[in-house]
Swiss-Prot record:
Subcellular location: Nucleus
Underlying gene: OSH3
Domain of life: Eukaryota
Protein name, entry field: Homeobox protein knotted-1-like 7
ELK domain sequence ranges: 227-247
Compositionally biased tracts (Basic and acidic residues): 1-11
């Protein structure tokens, strides 16, 4: 800048007034047009002096505007067709990261300053400036520089906003999906399953089925990538359907209909002393409840483990009955073997020999 002032030969210019009082805002110009003439150098120096004051609206704005226009180079910059674009690009750099109210104040102050400068230029009745290709090129380059500066300042903020929107969309998709209890396999089976759990699981399945019918899945309506989510849903809908069926099967294993469970409870209360149904009783219970015998077996096994403990008398009676049953079965076996041996000996030829062993049954030699 000192070299530019030396070319002008008019002494040192007063420092430009400060910018608007917003913290951490500083814009400096590091490039000037490549020209060896004093006129182009003066135009570069005048551009810096004319742009910065345009962002401050003090009480003596009219006097400052008139002071700017006292210099013909500054007046030419203010009256240049690209001055409005230059000022807008400069203000855009200041608006990056500012609140909406602060950005509006900056724009309002700039409009007032620009209006005063143009009014002063019109009142001065200066002759139309001749064409200056170097000044035109400088204004164009300076506008491009400010636009690039604004893009560099805005890029981190845009990336941060995009990241926040992505995280918000993922959180909303998680919250709008089925409850977590619908994805956890039931640890308890049989009669201990509560009606509340059934209601929660049913609601989760209804939500998933409705999402598949609408071909939208659990999509956040506020997200910007709806098309991508629809594409992914169409691509992986088969896997999601298979997973839903697997989860449904796992839940059905541990649940019994309310009416069937009540009938089993009634039978349990009537046979509490020995709640072990026979095969005939299991068949009858299966017909009355509509359940499979395997479900009935599991139900009573779990119920006995959790809610029933035989007394000492019952254990003794069970062991005694088992002992008598085993003895009767062995006696019937030997009687049957003897009867068959007697009949076979009368009808068989002399060469046929039958032997009976208690541990191996009947053998023929």
């Amino acid at each position: 800048m000192e070299e530019l002032e030396g070319h002008r030969g008019e002494g040192r210019l007063p420092p430009p007034p400060p910018l608007l009082p917003f913290p951490k805002v500083s814009v400096q110009v590091y490039t000037v047009p490549s020209s060896s003439t004093a006129a182009s150098a003066a135009a570069a120096g005048g551009a810096r002096q004319a742009v910065a004051p345009a962002t401050r609206d003090g009480g003596d704005g009219g006097g400052r505007a008139a002071g700017v226009l006292d210099d013909p180079v500054k007046a030419r910059i203010v009256s240049h067709p690209r001055y409005h674009r230059l000022l807008a690009a400069f203000l855009d750099c200041h608006k990056v990261g500012c609140p909406a109210e602060a950005a509006e104040e900056i724009a309002a102050a700039a409009r007032v300053r620009e209006a005063r400068q143009r009014a002063a230029a019109a009142a001065s009745r200066m002759p139309p400036a001749p064409e200056d290709p170097e000044l035109d090129q400088f204004m164009e380059d300076y506008c491009k520089l400010l636009v690039e500066c604004k893009e560099e300042l805005s890029r981190p903020l845009q990336e941060a906003e995009e990241f926040l929107r992505t995280v918000e969309s993922e959180l909303n998709s998680i919250n709008s999906g089925p409850p977590l209890t619908a994805l956890i396999s039931e640890s308890k089976a049989g009669l201990d399953s509560s009606d509340d759990d059934e209601h929660e699981d049913g609601s989760g399945m209804e939500m998933m089925e409705a999402a598949e019918d609408e071909d939208l899945g659990i999509i956040d309506p506020r997200s910007d990538d709806k098309a991508l989510k629809r594409h992914l849903l169409r691509k992986y809908s088969g896997y999601l359907g298979g997973l839903r069926k697997e989860l449904s099967k796992k839940r059905k294993k541990g649940k019994l209909p309310k009416e069937a469970r009540q009938k089993l409870l009634t039978w349990w209360e009537l046979h509490y002393r020995w709640p072990n149904p026979s095969e005939m009783e299991k068949i009858a219970l299966a017909e009355s409840t509509g359940l499979e015998q395997k479900q009935i077996n599991n139900c009573f096994i779990n119920q006995r483990k959790r809610h029933w403990k035989p007394t000492e008398e019952m254990e003794f009676a069970v062991m005694e009955a088992y002992h008598h049953q085993s003895t009767d079965a062995a006696a019937a076996f030997y009687v049957d073997v003897d009867a068959r041996l007697v009949g076979a000996t009368a009808a068989a030829p002399a060469s046929a020999v039958y032997t009976a062993r208690p541990d191996h049954g009947v053998w023929r030699a």
